[in-house]
């Protein structure tokens, strides 16, 4: 009786661990698919380039020194463009 109970509990534990590991692997594979461009990040990068250069041009037209707008989130303004730090 004890051996049957131990065997059932062991099988249940292995099944739970296997299912959890399979779900984690599936989630990781979906996040790291190769060949699929991350359009959201590309759009953010383009927006940052645009924001920085436009703000600089507007300040130049106003006969003021170009004070580059600070880029946020690990980016800095360099040569009228936001670049990653």
Curated annotation (Swiss-Prot):
Entry keyword Signal: yes
MF term (GO), any? toxin activity
Keywords of this entry: Disulfide bond, Neurotoxin, Postsynaptic neurotoxin, Secreted, Signal, Toxin
* InterPro entries in the record: Hwtx-2-like
Disulfide bonding pattern of the chain: 52-66, 56-77, 71-82
- A GO cellular component annotation in the UniProt record: extracellular region
| Tissues in which the UniProt entry reports expression | Expressed by the venom gland.
Name its cellular compartments: Secreted
Query: Propeptide positions in this record?
Result: 23-48
List the Pfam families hit by this protein, alphabetically: Toxin_20 (PF08089)
Annotated signal peptide = 1-22
What is the annotated role of this protein in its UniProt record? Postsynaptic neurotoxin.
* Family under the similarity heading: Belongs to the neurotoxin 12 (Hwtx-2) family. 02 (Hwtx-2) subfamily.
What is the protein name stated in its UniProt record? U4-theraphotoxin-Hhn1u
